[in-house]
């Protein structure tokens, strides 16, 4: 999905701090979406889509963490025995999560990289910038 690619492209300290994208990042993302697809999405529409993707990702992630659930990378969907789904369905507030019982979510891995990566730490040393990310150091 092009939006996810743009979000990942802007997932750098100059455009994103404290888990939020900057105004410049959003402006760039909206402009590039509108240019690529010859549309006129508003900033609010694009932000809402990002929030919808984030909510869906968190819902699936929470289910993957539940006992008895797993993630099928090939089919890009949750898997669990019927008894696990039945037990889960009996709980309160499970309606949104049950949505994923028979649906794939092809954006799960890409969104995991976007929302679950460790916090970026940037240090400026002798005119060099170092990004510390998931135990890797990248010098620019």
Question: How should each PLM-predicted stretch be described?
Answer:
Residues 1-37, 49-68:
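Eukaryotic helical DNA- and histone-tail-recognition domains of regulatory proteins
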Residues 15-22, 39, 93, 97-104:
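Amphipathic alpha-helical protein-protein interaction segments
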Residues 34, 47-140:
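Alpha-helical protein-interaction modules
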């Amino acid at each position: 999905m092009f939006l996810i690619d743009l979000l990942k492209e802007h997932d750098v300290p100059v455009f994103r701090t404290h888990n939020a994208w900057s105004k410049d990042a959003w402006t760039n993302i909206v402009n590039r979406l509108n240019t690529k697809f010859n549309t006129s999405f508003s900033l609010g529409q694009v932000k809402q889509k990002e929030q919808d993707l984030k909510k869906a990702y968190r819902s699936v992630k929470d289910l993957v963490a539940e006992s008895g659930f797993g993630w099928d990378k090939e089919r890009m969907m949750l898997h669990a025995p019927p008894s696990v789904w039945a037990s889960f369905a009996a709980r309160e507030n499970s309606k949104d999560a049950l949505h994923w019982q028979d649906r794939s979510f092809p954006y799960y891995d890409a969104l995991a990289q976007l929302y679950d990566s460790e916090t970026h730490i940037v240090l400026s040393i002798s005119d060099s910038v170092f990004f510390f990310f998931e135990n890797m150091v990248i010098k620019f």
